């Protein structure tokens, strides 16, 4: 039975899945929007939103926690210097997912996940 199994496996081990989410989160923070499969985008959304919520506090502890999940120092700096203050008054919902159709090669459903900065 599948009861209480919240996350998608994405056909990866837990270590591979965490590495994938860290890479996607780093790219999203750096670029502001990325295109990936719909399942990965839906799994990435709560991961990134928790990082942004931590960045809103701006504490040293929050910066160290975010450093565990963001691979590049530049992305972590952008998270705390730009995104945290930009979302300071917004109570969650920092990202949006837009479906973009099917991938030509294998028919996978693609989606664009982007930060809502306005």
Curated annotation (Swiss-Prot):
Source organism, top-level taxon: Bacteria
On whether Ribosomal protein is a keyword of this UniProt record, the answer is yes
GO annotation (BP), single: translation
A Gene Ontology MF term for this entry? structural constituent of ribosome
| One Pfam assignment | Ribosomal_L17
Q: Does the keyword Ribonucleoprotein apply?
A: yes
Family to which the UniProt record says this protein belongs? Belongs to the bacterial ribosomal protein bL17 family.
Full protein name? Large ribosomal subunit protein bL17
Task: Give the originating organism.
Answer: Gemmatimonas aurantiaca (strain DSM 14586 / JCM 11422 / NBRC 100505 / T-27)
* Gene that encodes it: rplQ
């Amino acid at each position: 039975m599948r009861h209480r199994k919240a996350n998608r496996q994405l056909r990866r081990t837990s270590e591979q899945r965490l590495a994938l989410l860290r890479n996607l989160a780093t790219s999203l923070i750096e670029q502001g929007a990325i295109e990936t499969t719909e399942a990965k985008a839906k799994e990435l959304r709560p991961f990134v939103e928790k990082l942004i919520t931590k960045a809103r506090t701006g504490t040293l502890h929050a910066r160290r926690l975010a450093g565990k999940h963001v691979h590049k120092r530049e992305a972590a700096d952008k998270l705390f210097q730009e995104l945290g203050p930009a979302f300071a008054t917004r109570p969650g919902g920092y990202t949006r997912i837009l479906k973009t159709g099917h991938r030509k090669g294998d028919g996978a459903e693609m989606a664009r996940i982007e930060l809502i900065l306005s």
